[in-house]
Amino acid sequence: MAGPEWQSLEQCLEKHLPPDDLAQVKRILYGKQTRNLDLPREALKAASERNFELKGYAFGAAKEQQRCPQIVRVGLVQNRIPLPTSAPVAEQVSALHKSIEEIAEVAAMCGVNIICFQEAWNMPFAFCTREKLPWTEFAESAEDGLTTRFCQKLAKKHNMVVVSPILERDREHGGVLWNTAVVISNSGLVMGKTRKNHIPRVGDFNESTYYMEGNLGHPVFQTQFGRIAVNICYGRHHPLNWLMYSINGAEIIFNPSATIGELSESLWPIEARNAAIANHCFTCALNRVGQEHFPNEFTSGDGKKAHHDLGYFYGSSYVAAPDGSRTPGLSRNQDGLLVTELNLNLCQQINDFWTFKMTGRLEMYARELAEAVKPNYSPNIVKEDLVLAPSSG
């Protein structure tokens, strides 16, 4: 596995390939080339001073006679935790708020309309430890918790929709915990929330020790800038999860994540891009950065030695379009903001071209899936009938 010193696939290719070969490799890896955004000089300067990467790209679409371009800019934020996990909870939250506020200010300079933060962005990703305290103290109300109020101020100040994934404390239902994304309108009002539908039990990802599968289905949020959905982390491995957000009308699906190199880095460039193609929508995959060390050792249930960290979060956030093209990723080892301009008309244009929704045969799969979930289901496997088999000789 590549270590944190290896910055990005893009940098490696650009360093070692001749220009003509590089162009062909990028054509295959990334599809139709995206346009570089001309970002404001003051934004680039602020990002440099605040020590985070700032990149900008744009997807185009064919000009139409009856519809104006539907242009929206999204901002994906990837970041490491600024304080040690042993620091007091309130101090860690405050430091993360400060870091995100600085990045959001730069996003506003770049004209971002919708900004999305990484999974459980206001805390360390401590679910590997299986310890309850102090990690459950990071949980907040989705409706009026400290982090939601902070994001409401950002949204109103910058006229920006905010997608804020947090550890939710549901006080209306016994104080249970959920892995939740809060969606805040550019007016500053909480539009609603969505919860992680699929919970991993893989290696150190011991999340079901804290929360279970979400119970809110696949809501899509009609914002001023387009219809958005949030497929949290592990849900990207489940094609039907993406499909249901698309069926409910999502034009942009965010995938805020916390995933490590040894487990999933080879899958990362494929899954969100696949989903964009299959569902005629834009997908936005973002991941945290760095290595988080915890005070107490924990084990993985694999016979290996106890350790203090989950692994290396490899960043590499990117956006994929319905035509299969994608942006280059942010780096593997640096905080960053990826600004991407989308023309939502491309969703319908690609739908008309490939017609996956028309040819999807949902009624057939609905019927067969309804049978498959029954306890007495018998798989439709055709076997050779030995009685009717022709005799030899």
Curated annotation (Swiss-Prot):
A Gene Ontology term for the protein's cellular component: cytosol
Phosphoprotein recorded as keyword: yes
Pathway membership: Amino-acid biosynthesis; beta-alanine biosynthesis
Top-level division of the source organism's lineage: Eukaryota
Transmembrane annotation, as ranges: none
Subcellular location(s) per record: Cytoplasm
Classification via Pfam families: CN_hydrolase
PANTHER family registered for this protein in UniProt: BETA-UREIDOPROPIONASE, NITRILASE C965.09-RELATED
Protein name, as recorded: Beta-ureidopropionase
Source organism: Mus musculus (Mouse)
